[in-house]
């Protein structure tokens, strides 16, 4: 890092980034007023595409899923690095995006996460173009779609979908996506998200009494889930986050559903937890059916996986061939086979887990870049970000913070203050040059595949 800092071209670029801070803020504020919920980022993407062209990047284009990419060509055969910020926000299109200012604080939904990062990408590109500095390897700028929620990392999954393409592979990945400027996220929290729907026939709460109740079955399932035991290390968690169902107090619901979130930093633990969830739900359905005089159901699981939206579906509770058993089934003399409850699973999201050691090269390069700018590194460790995808594939990757101060992310009260905001892009410039190498000044710090 010392060699880079002594080079005039690098100092000129660092100076440019500080002087460009006002323009960066202006573009930042313009973008935060453009609606961009996941899967609807097109307007913001077009804004970014034009700015990338103006900044001097080459090969600027919007890919098949809506990612905006542009390349700053390297001088030789160094590692190919991607730096990314996501264009989507968590807010629906109809959200009021009126920008407010009190003192030095700006408020607008999505102003920080992750609009600030996209603005910094554009400033970085301008700095490289204005000063002419180039790494040994190509640096690809990516304003990607669908990082948030049920976007399920769709944009970066698409980028890394074909690992067999040696020419197009990346040797390293840096995501800008945190309010703590000096923060480094280097572990990937994996997640499995399921929409679980319980199906029955439904009926009147009095005259239909005695048929299995989907809401009761879901209640049984939730009770079982709440008793799960998971390890503290590796941290593994579960939550039923949303429940829906029912039409009235005097109605046995025909259908109800719940959204379940499972997380772990360890892929094996996540797989075990997912299996435990499926077993608990199957048991809950069988218990509710048996309570009202229906036999135990054999489970069947049919994996239907859509590679485009990563939605998996499976079913438990085929109603064919039921054998009523002795049970108190209320006023109903003969249980009907088609009254039994069945359940379907839909995988709403899947984010892979992965780990790297804090001492690995890309983490320590980011630490050195922080120190060079006068910041003390905050090792955040594990989170769920776009870096999950490359980390899970064994590609060196981290997520770092953007410049300035912010808070209230994922709320309509989200805010941003441009305090020392240039330090984020300055750190990123040094990090990218250290990773890709700077010919005649410093060799690259990441392994480079042969192309």
How should each PLM-predicted stretch be described?
Residues 58, 65, 76-81, 95-96, ...:
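Short coil/turn connectors at secondary-structure junctions
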Residues 1-8, 12, 215-451:
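Metal-dependent amide/peptide-bond hydrolase catalytic core
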Residues 105, 110-189, 231, 250, ...:
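Acidic/histidine-rich catalytic neighborhood of metal-dependent amide-processing enzymes
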Residues 2-105, 308-309, 314-329:
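Acidic/His- and Gly-rich active-site-bordering loop/insert found
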Residues 97-108, 199-203, 371-373, 409-410:
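Glycine/charged-rich beta-loop-alpha catalytic/anionic-binding loops adjacent to active sites
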Residues 87-101, 186-197, 368, 398, ...:
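Acidic-glycine-rich active-site phosphate/pyrophosphate-binding loop
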Residues 83, 102-150, 192-198, 207-229, ...:
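Alpha-helical metal-binding/catalytic segments enriched in His/Glu/Asp
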Residues 73, 177, 197-201, 263-265, ...:
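Solvent-exposed residues in well-ordered beta-strands and their adjoining turns
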């Amino acid at each position: 890092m010392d060699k880079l800092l002594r080079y005039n071209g690098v100092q000129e670029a660092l100076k440019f980034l500080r002087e460009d801070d006002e323009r960066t803020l202006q573009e930042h504020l313009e973008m935060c007023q453009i609606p961009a919920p996941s899967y609807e980022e097109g307007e913001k993407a077009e804004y970014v595409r034009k700015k990338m062209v103006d900044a001097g990047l080459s090969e600027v284009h919007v890919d098949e899923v809506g990612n905006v990419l542009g390349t700053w060509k390297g001088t030789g055969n160094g590692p190919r690095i991607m730096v990314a910020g996501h264009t989507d926000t968590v807010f629906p299109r109809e959200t009021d995006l009126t920008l407010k200012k009190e003192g030095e604080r700006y408020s607008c939904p999505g102003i920080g996460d992750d609009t600030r990062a996209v603005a910094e990408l554009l400033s970085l590109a301008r700095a490289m173009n204005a000063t002419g500095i180039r790494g040994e390897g190509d640096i690809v700028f990516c304003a990607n779609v669908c990082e948030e929620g049920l976007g399920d990392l769709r944009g970066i999954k698409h980028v890394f979908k074909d690992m067999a393409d040696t020419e197009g592979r990346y040797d390293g990945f840096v995501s800008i996506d945190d309010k703590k400027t000096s923060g480094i996220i280097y572990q990937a929290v994996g997640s499995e998200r399921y929409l679980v729907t319980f199906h029955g026939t439904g009926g009147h709460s009095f005259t239909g009494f005695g048929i299995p109740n989907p809401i009761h079955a879901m209640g049984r399932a939730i009770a079982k889930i709440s008793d799960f035991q998971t390890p503290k290390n590796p941290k593994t968690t579960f939550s039923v986050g949303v429940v829906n169902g029912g039409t009235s107090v005097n109605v046995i619901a025909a259908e109800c559903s719940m959204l379940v979130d499972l997380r772990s930093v360890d892929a094996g633990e996540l797989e075990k937890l997912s299996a435990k969830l499926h077993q608990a739900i199957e048991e809950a359905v069988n218990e509710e059916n048996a309570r009202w005089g229906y036999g135990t159901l054999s489970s069947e699981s049919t994996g239907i996986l859509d590679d485009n939206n990563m939605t998996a579906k499976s079913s438990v509770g085929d109603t064919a061939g039921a054998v009523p058993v002795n049970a108190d089934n209320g006023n109903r003399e003969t249980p009907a086979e088609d009254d039994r409850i069945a359940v379907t699973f839909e995988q709403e999201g899947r984010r892979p887990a992965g780990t790297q050691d804090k001492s690995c090269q890309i983490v320590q390069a980011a630490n050195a870049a922080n120190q060079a700018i006068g910041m003390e590194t905050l090792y955040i460790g594990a989170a769920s970000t776009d870096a999950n995808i490359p980390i899970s594939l064994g590609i060196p990757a981290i997520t770092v913070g953007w410049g300035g101060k912010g808070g209230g992310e994922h709320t309509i009260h989200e805010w941003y203050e441009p305090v020392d905001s240039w330090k984020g892009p300055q750190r990123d410039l040094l990090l990218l040059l250290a990773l890709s190498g700077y010919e005649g000044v410093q060799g690259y710090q990441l392994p480079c595949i042969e192309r």
